């Protein structure tokens, strides 16, 4: 046994993911990578919109971005390029988030917990992050590889699983999460309403409409959320705009009076790590 390495002075999964704080840090990595979809120059959600009927390229200060769509999705193309397209990031960033979530899920029983409620809250958030990625992937690609545990050694034999099977698996996970994820969360983190909102979309994808009504109603009737019907925020006294304008102003997104906010992707000009100070470029790049 003396040849067996024991990481006493370095960080390793065995001596790091030992409590709620440590496992939640892995889920913070999921939150970080989730914001990559939206922020910065040519983020992938703009690529997705341009490759659909939602938008056309609006960039006028450089060439190359989304100019030859059929050519830019060929197998030998670079689909993670600010000057062309970042459509491929849905795959690479998605499976990174799945990896982080699976690390938490696989190690959930190895940590020390204060209560079952604390444990299941963290587990429920991990289920949410994994389900959120798979919901996007199956609607973009159809059948995709389904990875449900932490991978700790080289693996090459990945096979696709049917879209419906994946949707049914993530529905089951989200139903568990909806029972345990807490109602309140720090701005930018996952709360119960976010779980039920995603569960509603999964139910709709499965054409299980009564279940969709139930999960949507859980958000609408939680006493916290609801449709905004009155002007609010920084421009509420400006007669030239309306409530739709109010909802889409960055100054108003995180206001407590905004009852339509469920889960916020947080950016801050004072945070420079990992592009956290970057803003949305959709008004520049998508028309």
Q: Predicted segment positions?
A:
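Short, well-structured active-site flanking segments
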Residues: 138-149, 209-216
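Short linear capping/connector segments at secondary-structure termini
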Residues: 8-12, 79, 148-155
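Structural transition elements
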Residues: 153-165, 208-211
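Conserved, well-structured interaction surfaces
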Residues: 19-43, 61-141, 157, 161-164, ...
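Glycine- and aromatic-rich loop/turn segments at beta-sheet edges
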Residues: 145-150, 179-188, 227-233
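Solvent-exposed loop/turn segments at secondary-structure junctions
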Residues: 144, 152-153, 268-270
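An aromatic- and glycine-enriched ligand-binding surface/loop that stacks and positions planar moieties
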Residues: 2-65, 175, 193-287
